Amino acid sequence: MDELPILPTTVIGSYPRPKWLREAIRLHKAGKISDEDLQEAFDDAVVTVLHDHEIAGVDVPTDGEMRRDEMVEFFAERLAGFKFYGPVRVWGTNYYRKPSVVSKVEYIKPMLVDEFLFAKSVSYTENLKITITGPYTIAEWSYNEYYKSKKDLAFDLAKVINSEMKKLVEAGAKIIQVDEPAIHTHKNEVEWAIEAVNESIKGINVKVVMHVCYGEYSYLEPYLDKLNVDQINLALKNYNYEPVKLFKKWDREIGVGVIDVHNKRIETPEEVANDLKMLLDYFKPEMIWVNPDCGLKLLPRKIAFQKLLNMVKGTKIVREELKNKGYNSTSLKPLVNR
């Protein structure tokens, strides 16, 4: 299907793991259950997540990234050139397995195709989104012990990510999201970081989204016209929508974050509807996709589900008003020739 309802609803990627999956992972690490049993638990979790998304009414779901611990670690474990020395403290008592690049980064084999095909086989819709961490974020969140510069590393990463994306398209992916939460970390690197993203999506003839969450959006604004994605996806609710004014000249699709993922307070449908009506003062209806600010994995599952449910309910309020004005659907086709 090449069309979605006006104001399509989606998720960013991650979703809370069910408690029983977390227990299965613990038991597997302790050697108490087999690899086969763990894979069955992952499969069951994906079915559960897609069921939650279906009941909530999400138009474009994901598999919740059930098989991924972290967004950089997952890919570093599956590419040549990376090594892990041990956990690094990020903040407080939170630790992260930060990878080190010790040799040339190279593509070995598909990393996401199997998980995409399984999710596709159990999904309630063919409009399933698959997410992949972008080249700049992997480079920024890794130790570089091999390349002359972070830029050189990012462009090699772009090549391997491009190889993976092409495999996903061959497998039937219709929507691919590049996650670049770090892209606006350093003002003087944004221009070439966007070039690296463009390199990673070259030749990808399906809808491509770039998700950018919390940070300095003003660093991105001067280079938006150089970005070759069909949609840019932003965290806005947590910022009280202040960054919106920076994207007034953006003329493609925009994913608007209307759910705060760092707050357990559940937004009401009316609140979501009012926020969307305000955003329609900035963007045409056919440009807007509706989503949470970021991934939902850190929230309790019941709260994450209720937030999604109310997001969809609020969107439907505005959708009905738009239908009365002649707006019915949004195209799923890519907007940019890459």
From Swiss-Prot:
Q: What is its EC number?
A: 2.1.1.-
Q: Which cofactor does it need?
A: Zn(2+)
Q: Which SUPFAM superfamilies match?
A: UROD/MetE-like (SSF51726)
Q: In which pathway does it act?
A: Amino-acid biosynthesis; L-methionine biosynthesis via de novo pathway
Q: List the disulfide bonds.
A: none
Q: Where does the signal peptide begin and end?
A: none
Instruction: Say yes or no: keyword Lyase present.
Output: no
* Transmembrane regions: none
Can you tell me which family this protein belongs to? Answer: Belongs to the archaeal MetE family.
Descriptive protein name: Methionine synthase
Q: What organism does the record attribute this protein to?
A: Sulfurisphaera tokodaii (strain DSM 16993 / JCM 10545 / NBRC 100140 / 7) (Sulfolobus tokodaii)
